[in-house]
């Protein structure tokens, strides 16, 4: 099993190029199911979840015409098997995103209930209830969602809670429904906007993406298109947080500052100096960070996917911070691993109280999920001595060659078998 070996203490300098966003690329790949025409996706990150999704689409009947680095050309002219098996879905919960497009395009879908990260319950009931409201007949049989429908009908759907994948699934399904669909309490994430832009490029009629009310007027068919996936705002935030913790001067390219307003604000609170341009962000940090308290919430508030990285930073900050997680239960599993590095953290329910100390000490730690992996890397970069991060297969689900990018910025980090 592969591990990362990190020798802490180096400042990070130079330039890092940001990859396409996994959480934008996955629904965009699924959007290829909505048209019989050729569909091209650019700026695809090279990640395990992307490879898994492409394999799933091939099983469904999509032909991968080209799969060059960063680009995939897809043809869903013949969907022969509208099924996502448990073996395929169990490692990637985003596979649920084929449900809406398959049902809208073929009138049927047989989808295993999803797996993915072990960070708490992420129910798909909002997907199912929304599709049922559009006229689908859906049942749960032996761990599978069995869905059938004629042409879906537009309707008003008020979601009980904010769900990104639920919003994306229903938005895709509604593009081919008869009439108008109104999604209320919709997710506002930039990845939802990116998917809407992709669908509009295919001929969909969508208004309001980026707000909590999205209106979709169904059309008879969608056509082929080419779409460039947005930059990964979480990868961007992860590297910025690493520099704020370690110190240094880094410029991130091929990224967007406008998707990270709250994160950038919190980094400025730590004492970092930040400059931004149209497609770049520069962060400079010359001293020990100040602590930042935060509360995760749906976009545009502080993202849950950045909570763990900020906990690593707060572990060595000059003071005490309070961090509250409101999105997922069980998303403090990295706390016990940080404590192995001598971090001073107490967890009370969904809140962690972090008392910053001047220096973490290197040790062997184990990654429990994707963002916890990034947290432990940042902690290892600031720790004294050697840190070994085990179970890094989580990393390859969401970060493209993170150790190489950090190494080119001066980090002493390498992957070993």
Swiss-Prot record:
It catalyses: phosphoenolpyruvate + UDP-N-acetyl-alpha-D-glucosamine = UDP-N-acetyl-3-O-(1-carboxyvinyl)-alpha-D-glucosamine + phosphate. The modification 2-(S-cysteinyl)pyruvic acid O-phosphothioketal is found at residue 117. Its EC number is 2.5.1.7. Pfam families: EPSP_synthase. The active site is at 117 (proton donor). It is found in: Cytoplasm. Pathway: Cell wall biogenesis; peptidoglycan biosynthesis. Keywords: Cell cycle, Cell division, Cell shape, Cell wall biogenesis/degradation, Cytoplasm, Peptidoglycan synthesis, Pyruvate, Transferase. One of its GO terms (biological process) is peptidoglycan biosynthetic process. Phosphoenolpyruvate binds at residues 22-23. GO terms for cellular component: cytoplasm. UDP-N-acetyl-alpha-D-glucosamine binds at residues 93, 122-126, 305, 327. InterPro entries: Enolpyruvate_Tfrase_dom, Enolpyruvate_Tfrase_sf, MurA_subfamily, RNA3'P_cycl/enolpyr_Trfase_a/b, UDP_GlcNAc_COvinyl_MurA. GO terms for molecular function: UDP-N-acetylglucosamine 1-carboxyvinyltransferase activity. Cell wall formation. Adds enolpyruvyl to UDP-N-acetylglucosamine. NCBIfam families: murA (TIGR01072), PRK09369.1 (NF006873). Belongs to the EPSP synthase family. MurA subfamily. This is UDP-N-acetylglucosamine 1-carboxyvinyltransferase. It comes from Nitrosomonas europaea (strain ATCC 19718 / CIP 103999 / KCTC 2705 / NBRC 14298).
């Amino acid at each position: 099993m592969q591990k990362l070996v990190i020798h802490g203490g180096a400042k990070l300098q130079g330039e890092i190029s940001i990859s396409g966003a996994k959480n934008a690329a996955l629904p965009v790949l699924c959007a290829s199911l909505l048209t019989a025409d050729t569909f091209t996706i650019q700026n695809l990150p090279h990640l395990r979840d992307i490879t898994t999704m492409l394999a799933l689409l091939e099983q469904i009947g999509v032909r991968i015409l080209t799969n060059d680095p960063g680009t995939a050309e897809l043809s869903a002219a013949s969907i022969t098997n509208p099924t996502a098996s448990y073996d395929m879905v169990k490692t990637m919960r985003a596979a649920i995103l084929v449900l809406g497009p398959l049902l809208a395009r073929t009138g049927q879908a047989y989808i295993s209930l999803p797996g993915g990260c072990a960070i708490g319950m992420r129910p798909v009931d909002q997907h199912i209830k929304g599709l049922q409201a559009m006229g689908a007949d859906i049942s749960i049989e032996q761990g599978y969602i069995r869905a059938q429908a004629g042409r879906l009908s537009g309707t008003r759907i008020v979601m009980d809670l904010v769900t990104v994948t639920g919003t994306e699934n229903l938005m895709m399904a509604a593009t081919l429904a008869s009439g108008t669909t109104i999604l209320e309490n919709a997710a506002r994430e930039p990845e939802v906007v990116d998917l809407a832009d992709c669908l509009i490029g295919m001929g969909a009629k969508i208004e309001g993406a980026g707000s909590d009310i999205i209106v979709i007027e169904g059309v008879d068919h969608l056509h082929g298109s080419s779409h460039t996936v947005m930059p990964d705002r979480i990868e961007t935030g992860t590297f910025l947080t690493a520099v704020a913790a370690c110190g240094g001067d880094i410029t991130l390219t091929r990224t967007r500052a406008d998707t990270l307003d709250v994160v950038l604000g919190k980094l400025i609170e730590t004492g970092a100096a930040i400059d931004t341009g149209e497609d770049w962000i520069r962060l400079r940090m010359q001293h020990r960070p100040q602590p930042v308290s935060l509360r995760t919430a749906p976009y545009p508030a502080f993202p849950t996917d950045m909570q763990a990285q900020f906990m690593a930073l707060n572990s060595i900050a000059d003071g005490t911070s309070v961090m509250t997680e409101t999105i997922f239960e069980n998303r403090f599993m990295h706390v016990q691993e940080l404590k192995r590095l001598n971090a001073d953290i107490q967890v009370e329910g969904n809140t962690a109280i972090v008392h910053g100390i001047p220096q973490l000490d290197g040790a062997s730690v184990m990654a429990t999920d994707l963002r916890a992996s990034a947290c432990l890397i940042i902690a290892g970069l600031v720790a004294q001595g050697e840190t070994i991060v085990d179970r890094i297969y989580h990393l390859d689900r969401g970060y493209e060659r993170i150790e190489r990018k950090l190494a080119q910025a001066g980090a002493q980090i390498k992957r070993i078998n």
